[in-house]
């Protein structure tokens, strides 16, 4: 049903372009896989030109089908939105629009030495100025009395940007590029260097170099934006030793930034299938999923079950600083005159990757479906637990010394119990992150909305509902990330209002009694304790 909204979903492993109708239903889509480059251990890169080519190819394929099937005219497409892999960082020459280096992907760990450097820099400033952590949940004890807790060096910038010092975020990647790439330094010296996350790179090129922008959600993942002012912060930039003048202009997540004007000359521009269409929505991928799930009320949350889990919890207009190591981020901002909505974010490192581990490493099954079937064939795990701390434990424990364990094994244990324990471990970790979010925010969760590849597993969602003691709801379409970007663009152009009916595809309600739930959580805590102190992190 006309009109239509398009959405570019530029992710870590692929690029997609999806066309939605006025009802929010998918009309057409195309996907292209991306090449990841690993020039050194721990390094992950993308070719910026390949990303652009994949976007254009997806658009061309969809638009060809659009016209061949008489869906409408170009004028029936009112806008496009963009959602993207967050934190991935690219720099380019503003005169040539050519990348000065491959994009450094969010999961790249090359900046770990910089993390140590900035931690030491922060520690000196903390010690010199005796800075206290006002958000700490623990205190030091001196002479039998509780005292104030000194700020940890990794949290030195957290009050302003909501993030700890980590190789994950864009600011350190930009610092690395300046330290290690002569082409970047030369372009900066000429006044020709621009930096951006992937959304900035796409908007710059789609508008023919007219718009150097990012939105508040992507900017909030750089460590360079002040959460209160929604602007680049000079103190943050100075601390991380990056030039503020090369950063994109920060805009809301829903407004017309520019129009598609792509091509080397006017003739090529006119021939682009989306020429003249407004670019009107930009959101980082996890925030886009929140919007796509219609999580607009304070206290609503979503979990994306993929390789790991990404959980976001809407805290409304409040900037909530976690006492459990969760991240504080911008959830969305619909229009430059609207107040921003904030969120707490937490992650589960091993979810779908735990299932892959059972298949690829342990040979327990040949497919994800077989894992689900095995898990369904038993009523419980037979008292065993799997703690997938392959690289330590994330929120709320933050223990680098932890490693994966299976505990509670007996002669009765078989591969069905192991399969079920892996699914349960994802749900137990999700419970702990959501529990921390509720404690930090002071709000009670009413239901959990879910998406991602693992959300197809109904047993997983039932277990999750049982452990949370809350309904778990999934939408009809699991393409919530793409729809979130389209929705932001649709709001900016008047296609949709700021609320839309959430289309339920499945609802799972608790079936586990409270005593069994309490016992299971108690045993999980015991299993967690067995995973600790495996690695000496001090040496």
Swiss-Prot record:
Q: What is its EC number?
A: 2.7.1.30
Q: Which domain of life is it from?
A: Eukaryota
**Which InterPro entries does the entry mention?**
ATPase_NBD (IPR043129), Carb_kinase_FGGY (IPR000577), Carb_kinase_FGGY_CS (IPR018483), FGGY_C (IPR018485), FGGY_N (IPR018484), GK1-3_metazoan-type (IPR042018)
Enzyme class of the recorded protein, top EC level: transferase
- Per UniProt, ATP binds at 16, 307, 352, 453-457
Q: Which GO terms describe its biological process?
A: glycerol catabolic process; glycerol metabolic process; glycerol-3-phosphate biosynthetic process; triglyceride metabolic process
Please give an example of a GO cellular component term from this record.
mitochondrion
- GO MF term set: ATP binding; glycerol kinase activity
Q: Which residues bind substrate?
A: 12, 86, 168, 285
Pathway the protein takes part in: Polyol metabolism; glycerol degradation via glycerol kinase pathway; sn-glycerol 3-phosphate from glycerol: step 1/1
Q: Which reaction does it catalyse?
A: glycerol + ATP = sn-glycerol 3-phosphate + ADP + H(+)
Q: Name one Pfam family in it.
A: FGGY_C
Keywords, alphabetical: ATP-binding, Glycerol metabolism, Kinase, Nucleotide-binding, Transferase
Q: Which family does the similarity line name?
A: Belongs to the FGGY kinase family.
Specify the protein name. Probable glycerol kinase
Q: Which organism is it from?
A: Dictyostelium discoideum (Social amoeba)
Gene name tied to this protein = gk
